[in-house]
């Protein structure tokens, strides 16, 4: 019986063994699928809004919704790219020496899948609401206001998920499994920790609504684009250093 079970035990041990290379392709695949699903949805949502043009609604209303939809998609792609680049850089530099690092990687990828689905749900619900209000003949101001404020709970949940993902990446970099890359891993740990903290603060954008305001401080898509722009400026030096490190390793 032990002889017959030996191949199965060897297979299970192989699956449980920590190996960074086993994660590389999976990481690329998960982030690519998330981006693809969101990209496929964009034309359908845009066409649903455009189909309401003959409802005698101001073209500026349709244009405003389409522009904000494009802003949200752009912000989403930038965030997914940033998550992917930090995740893969940390994994490539640190390697994996412990089973708990595999669990951390799995949690990050699971949140990526959930996040992509959550974004699609938010945009679908916003588009459906806008179509209903346009067909009902509501004013331009009401349509745009409801578009921005609709799905507040889902948007906050999305920001908190991103914060958790960056926090998990910080823990992954903190393991410093590769002693030759301690300096780079420390920089990545610090950056991901700061990003996690910033995304924990972003839900404060909706704080005025608790005190009677009808809108948040700013549309969340625009806030994330501003964050991305500032992030790219501040992290240019780190990116150059990591690029040189990866070139040297190859």
Residue ranges and their predicted role:
Residues 2-250:
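Multi-pass alpha-helical transmembrane bundle typical of ion/small-solute transporters
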């Amino acid at each position: 019986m032990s002889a017959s079970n030996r191949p199965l035990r060897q297979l299970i041990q192989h699956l449980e063994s920590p190996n960074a290379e086993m994660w590389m392709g999976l990481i690329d695949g998960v982030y690519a699928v998330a981006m693809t699903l969101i990209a496929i949805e964009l034309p359908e949502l845009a066409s649903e809004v455009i189909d309401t043009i003959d409802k005698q609604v101001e073209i500026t209303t349709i244009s405003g919704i389409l522009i904000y939809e494009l802003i949200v998609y752009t912000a989403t792609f930038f965030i997914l790219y940033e998550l992917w680049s930090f995740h893969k850089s940390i994994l490539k530099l640190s390697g994996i020496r412990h089973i708990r690092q595999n669990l951390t990687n799995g949690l990050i990828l699971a949140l990526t899948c959930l996040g992509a689905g959550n974004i699609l749900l938010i945009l679908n619900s916003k588009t459906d609401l806008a179509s209903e209000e346009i067909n009902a003949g509501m004013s331009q101001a009401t349509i745009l206001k409801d578009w921005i404020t609709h799905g507040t709970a889902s948007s906050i949940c999305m920001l908190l998920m991103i914060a958790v993902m960056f926090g998990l990446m910080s823990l992954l970099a903190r393991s410093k499994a590769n002693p030759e890359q301690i300096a780079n891993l420390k920089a990545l740990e610090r950056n991901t920790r700061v990003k996690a903290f910033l995304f924990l603060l972003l839900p404060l954008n909706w704080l005025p609504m608790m005190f009677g305001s009808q809108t948040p401080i700013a549309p969340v898509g625009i806030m994330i684009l501003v964050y991305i722009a500032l992030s790219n400026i501040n992290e240019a030096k780190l990116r150059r250093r990591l690029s040189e490190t990866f070139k040297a390793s190859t």
